[in-house]
Amino acid sequence: EIVTMGEGENTEEKIGDDKINSTYMWITQDKKYLTIEFQYYGTHSEDKKHFLNLVINNKEAEPAADDANDEYIDLEFRHNDEGDTADRLGEGYISFKLDKIQDQMKGKKGLRIRVKTLYNGEKFYEVKFPSSN
């Protein structure tokens, strides 16, 4: 499920912004899920749980004037390593339901997702919605 920064307990500290790589992203044909293949560093201990979130970040005081004309919906893929040691590289998959942004999808080409990568800092990935047949 997509979470909104600042809503309820969804604070910057809880959601985190630790480094993570996205190696592949895709949206299901029915546009209901975004799946992300990812890499991260950790100890891979059962005692250390990492948290992953897909975030709507409304921290900007005023949206840019051209936001209404933007062809992509902006989201952030966030990682909280909960203080785990960056011991070895691991990988996995996670899927997020897109129902919270379903109304915003009309007329858009896809999603623009911000990721704080392991090696290259902040990157933005554009993932297009599948074409309807």
Task: Please give the residue ranges for each predicted region.
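A general secondary-structure signal for short beta-strands and their flanking turns/coil
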Residues: 31-33, 70-72, 89-91, 108, ...
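Short beta-strand elements
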Residues: 119-133
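Short, solvent-exposed, Trp/other aromatic-anchored flexible loops in extracytoplasmic proteins
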Residues: 78-112, 116-118
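Short loop/turn segments at connectors of secondary-structure elements within structured domains
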Residues: 46-48, 107-109, 121
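Short helix-loop boundary/capping segments
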Residues: 23-80
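Surface-exposed beta-loop interaction hotspot
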Residues: 1-39
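Ser/Thr- (and often Asn-) enriched beta-sheet segments in non-cytosolic proteins
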Residues: 4, 72-76, 95, 112-114, ...
